[in-house]
C-alpha cells in the first residue's frame, strides 16, 4: 500500500513539473504555435500572417520568408493565404530525443521596412512509442538462502515519448514468492526491485517464471513486457553491496584524459571466492559512455578516456555492476550521476542575417538597418553574450530577443556632414576571462533634398541711376545648395508682383542659371523711387526646395525736372499774380506767397526763392523768403515808394545743373479802405456777399419752419432708419470717424461732411489718400448743413492715430520745400519720422522762423538732411482748433490746415497732387470753377468761396 502511494505522488509531481515548464515556454516567444508529431503533409499549424499583423497582399511585395538554422524544410508558409503548414514528416524523438522541450524556431523576415519576427513551433508528443525493456528475457539466479524481503533490482523500461506518454506504470504477474516494489528517489526516477515475499525451496521450486508489464500513460495505452526467469541456487547467498546506490559527481568539461572520476567500493558478506568482486560497466551502458569512461575491474576506479564537451552532453549516467566470484556469482549495482561543469571555451559568433543599404538621410529614428544574430555554445554566464557598437555614431543596437539585436537609427543623419559609416559590432560573453568576436558593417547614406538653396544674406540693396539703358545689368544673385547632384542644381526666378499698374517682369528680369538681374527698360525716379522685389532660388530635387532673397533697388534721382509754379488759389492761372497791399502795413507783412514744386527729390527738389532786382530797384520794400517763397515787406511803406511794383521771383532747385522757373507778382499799393483784410485774401466783391448770404439763410430758415410740422414724422422715420442701418463710406453720421487712409503701418481717421479723394498708382511712391477741408462752402440750398458744419464740426477735428508711422514713400518726399498754406503737399522720400521741412504754415515772421540747415551732400539718401528750429516752434493746437498741418499716413502729402472763423472770407486752395494725370485733373477743375464763378456773379448769388 505504501509503495502504491509513493508511486502516485511521484507521478503527480512529475506531471505538475511538466505543466509549469510548458507554461513558462509559452510566454517566452513572440509568436508560438504547436503541432503534433507525425502530422501529415499540409497539416494546418497557424495563420502566421494574420497573427503577425501582416496583410496577405504584402507578403510577396515585402519578400515574406521563413528562415531556420536547422530543420527549415519541416514547415512552410503558403504566401497566398498566410497559413503555416507541415511540409514534411516531424518526428519529435528524432528532433529532440528525451528532452522535455521540443520546439522548432523560425525567423520570419519581411522587408520594406525590414521586420523580423521570432516564431516558435512546439512539437507535441503523441503516444507513438511503446515502453521497451533492455531485453525481452531476463534470467535471475536467486539463492535459496536469501532472506525474506530480499530485493533484486530490475532495469525498468524506457519510453521514447515524453510527459504523460512516457509516464510508465508496472505490473508483475501474480506469484507467491515475489512481488514488485517501485521506489522513487529525489530525482523523480524510479527504481524497480523484485522482492522476495516467501522463502524459496529449490527442491520444491527450481525456477520461477514472471512477466513484467510496463504501461505508459498515453491514449491509447501502449505496453511492453519482459519475461523474468528466476533460477534458485543453493550456495553463495550474499551479493556485493555498494556504500551508496547513487554516486553524484561534478567534473569540468576540460578535464584531461585519465582523470579519476570516482572510486567505487563494494562489499560481499560471503567468504572466499564468493566475496571476490569484479567491477564492470552495466550491460545496458551506451557506446558513448564506453568511449568516454573506463573502469578498473579490480579497484573500481572510473577514469575519463575521451574528451568531454559540455556543449555535446551536459551529464552522464553510468550503471556499474559489482559481481562476486561465487558459484553462481552474485551482483550488486549502483549508478554514477556525472554532471559536467561548463567553462568559457567557446568564442561568440556574430552574423548579419539581413541588411538594408543604403539608408536615406531622412530616415526616421528607429529605422531597422540590419538584424544581427549572436550565439555562444557555452552556457550560463559563459554563454550570455552582449553586443556593443562603435561609439559616437548615430546608430544603436536594440535587443529584440535573446541573442538577437537590431541595428537601428538612433539620431538624425546628415549626408552633408558624414556620407558613410564603418561600424564595428563587438560580441562579448560573460565568462572570466571573457571571449569576444567582431564584425564590420559598412553603411552608406543616400542624399535627399533636405537643404534649400541659401543666399549669403537675406537682403541686398542696389543703387541704379534713373534713365539707365534698357537691358542694363544691375546685380547678380547667387545661392548655394549643400545637397548633391540634381538636388544642388539651382535655378533663379522672379517672384511676380504688381508695381503700380504694371507687372514686375516689365521692369526687371533674372537669368535662370547665372542669377544676373537686368533692368528691361529705363527707370524713372519720379515714377518708381524704390523697386523692391524677391528672387527665388529653387533646386531640382523632388520635391524642389527654394528660398527667397529681397532686392531693394533704389532709383537714384537725376535733376531732370525743373520747378513748376502753382496757382496761388483756385480758379487762377499760374502766371502773373496781382496783390493789393494797404499803405499802412508795417514791416514783415506777408504780401503774397510763391508756390512751386519739383518732381525730383533730395537736392534736386530742394527749392530756394530769390528776387531778381532790376536797375533802380534798390528801394523796393519787399523781400522773399529763401525757402518759404513768402513775399513780405521789409519796412513800413511811405509815399516815396512807387504805387505799383512788378516783382520777379526766381525759383531754383539745387541740382547739378540747377533748373529754374520765374514767377511774376504785381503788387499795387492802395489805401486801407480799398484793400481787403490781409487775413481774408478774397476776390473783389467778396465783402458784399455777406448780406446776400444772410438773406438767403433767412429765407431758408423760414421755409424750413413752415414745413417742419408736415415733415416731423418723415424726419423721425428717416432718423430711425439712419440709426438702424450701418453708416457707409459715402454717408457717415455726424461725429463718426471716417477712415481717411490706411496702410500696412497704420491708419488715420477724420470726421467731415465732405471729402475729396485723390488716387494714385499702386507703386510705393504713390498711394491712395483722402484730403478733407475743415470749413466747407455750401450752396444756397444747403444753408442748414452749412450751419451745422460750422457750429458743430469745424471746431472739432479728429486727431490722427498716434500709432501710424512714416511710409517709405512719405519719407522720400520730405526733402521738397513746397508746402501749401491751406492744403500743402510734399513729395515722399526715404527720410525718417524725425525730419521736418520748413514751411510758411507757421505764419511766423522771418526773424522768428525756424533755422534751416542745408543738406551736407547730394543724392537720393536724404537721411543726412537735418532741420533745426529756433524759438519759433509751432504752438500746440487747442481743443477746438485744427492743427496747422497734418500728415496722412501712407501718402506722400503733408496737409496744413488753419482754422478760421466761420464767416471769414479766406479762400481755401485746392488739393494738388503730383504727376501729369493730377495736373490735368487740376486744370480741368480750375476751368470748371471759373465757369461756375462767372455764373454765380451774374446771378447775384453769394456763396462761400472756400475751396475743398
Curated annotation (Swiss-Prot):
It is found in: Cell membrane. Residues 719-948 are cytoplasmic. PROSITE patterns: CADHERIN_1, CADHERIN_2. Residues 783-795, 907-921 have a biased composition (Basic and acidic residues). Residues 755-801, 829-854, 868-948 are annotated as: Disordered. Residues 1-22 form the signal peptide. The keyword Cell division does not apply. The keyword Signal applies. Pfam families: Cadherin, Cadherin_2, Cadherin_tail. GO terms for biological process: cell adhesion; homophilic cell adhesion via plasma membrane adhesion molecules; nervous system development. Residues 734-892 are annotated as: 5 X 4 AA repeats of P-X-X-P. GO terms for molecular function: calcium ion binding. It is a single-pass type I membrane protein. Glycans are attached at residues 257, 265, 362, 548. Residues 30-133, 157-242, 243-350, 351-455, 456-565, 588-678 form the Cadherin domain. GO terms for cellular component: plasma membrane. PXXP repeats lie at residues 734-737, 797-800, 830-833, 871-874, 889-892. The chain crosses the membrane at residues 698-718. Residues 23-697 are extracellular. Keywords: Calcium, Cell adhesion, Cell membrane, Glycoprotein, Membrane, Repeat, Signal, Transmembrane, Transmembrane helix. PANTHER family: CADHERIN-87A (PTHR24028), PROTOCADHERIN ALPHA-2 (PTHR24028:SF60). Potential calcium-dependent cell-adhesion protein. May be involved in the establishment and maintenance of specific neuronal connections in the brain. This is Protocadherin alpha-2. It comes from Pan troglodytes (Chimpanzee). The lineage of its organism: Eukaryota, Metazoa, Chordata, Craniata, Vertebrata.
